[in-house]
Amino acid sequence: MELTGVTAQSIFDDNAADLKLSWVAGLEGADRAFDVDFAKEATSAADLVGHLNLIHPNRIQVLGKPEITYYQRLSEENRKRQMGELILLEPPFLVVADGVDPPPDLELRCTRSSTPLFTSPISSAAVIDHLRLYLSRISAPRVTMHGVFLDILGMGVLIMGDSGLGKSELGLELISRGHGLVADDAVDFVRLGPDFIEGRCPPLLQNLLEVRGLGLLDIKTIFGETAVRRKMKIKLIVQLVRRNDGEFERLPLDSQYMDVLGLPIHMVKIQVAAGRNLAVLVEAAVRNTILRLRGIDTLRDFMDRQRAAMQAEAASHSPQGRLL
């Protein structure tokens, strides 16, 4: 996993409010980070954070009430040996959760070794789950794409096309028809799972839509809270193309896809021409995609129907054989 620039300080700053973290020792270790080789070998965030485990010393170590109870039952010699082995390998930081006070000798050892030590009143399991989700997000593959990203009938749809084709105007019309804006112009996509890509709006462009001749429109202010969305999973790409009959396939036999972060996303192409109601066409494309996801393929059904008709016609014209 890619965790360049992720330090104890950055993790603390991003999660202090949610986890109610307090930094009690090891302030000098603010730049402490994951071991590079360990981070590269990690297959998921579950490898990067967990309960106290000396077998995996390079991950974030979370100590709840059971771990602290176990630690306090150890002899002083065993405490020094086990914590010495752990801290020697420089974990990013330690978290004492469940509202338990860290043992004084553990706090002292963290101070002397510049190992960040945090405390949290939240349960250790919740701390681990939260940090795993956080690390999954910041380490996930991501890309910024140009277009208008909308929630249409509950489906994340990215409208793309050359400049001047009317993407923003189309987005505005769809919003006026009750659909929701996620992002305009720049959309940040992040792959959070094997078949899960989430799109969000950069904070600077939140709720804004740029329309030629009108300038910037604050969609949330104009249309209300229900006209904007924070995030959506991308399921469909609508590519607007200029009218060029020589290159446009009216009835594509094979589904078209666009690769986004290594995942094929279903794509439809719509020609832009005078008199065409693009908003209705996009809504129809979304409804058709919903049917395809349910296993209903209109084109395939038509081809099967046509094939059956041709076979029936061929059978009706076949020679009947002669009686001898």
Curated annotation (Swiss-Prot):
Leader sequence residues: none
Binding-site residues for ATP, renumbered to this chain: 161-168
GO MF annotation terms: ATP binding; magnesium ion binding; phosphorelay sensor kinase activity; protein serine/threonine kinase activity; protein serine/threonine/tyrosine kinase activity
Reactions this protein catalyses: [HPr protein]-L-serine + ATP = [HPr protein]-O-phospho-L-serine + ADP + H(+); [HPr protein]-O-phospho-L-serine + phosphate + H(+) = [HPr protein]-L-serine + diphosphate
GO biological process, any: regulation of carbohydrate metabolic process
Region (Important for the catalytic mechanism of dephosphorylation): 271-276
EC number(s) stated in the UniProt entry for this protein: 2.7.11.-, 2.7.4.-
Cofactor: Mg(2+)
Record flagged with keyword Magnesium: yes
Record keywords: ATP-binding, Kinase, Magnesium, Metal-binding, Multifunctional enzyme, Nucleotide-binding, Serine/threonine-protein kinase, Transferase
SUPFAM superfamilies the record matches: HprK N-terminal domain-like (SSF75138), PEP carboxykinase-like (SSF53795)
Main EC class the enzyme belongs to: transferase
Reported function: Catalyzes the ATP- as well as the pyrophosphate-dependent phosphorylation of a specific serine residue in HPr, a phosphocarrier protein of the phosphoenolpyruvate-dependent sugar phosphotransferase system (PTS). HprK/P also catalyzes the pyrophosphate-producing, inorganic phosphate-dependent dephosphorylation (phosphorolysis) of seryl-phosphorylated HPr (P-Ser-HPr).
Family per similarity comment: Belongs to the HPrK/P family.
Domain note: The Walker A ATP-binding motif also binds Pi and PPi.
Record's miscellaneous remark: Both phosphorylation and phosphorolysis are carried out by the same active site and suggest a common mechanism for both reactions.
Protein name, UniProt field: HPr kinase/phosphorylase
The gene coding this protein: hprK
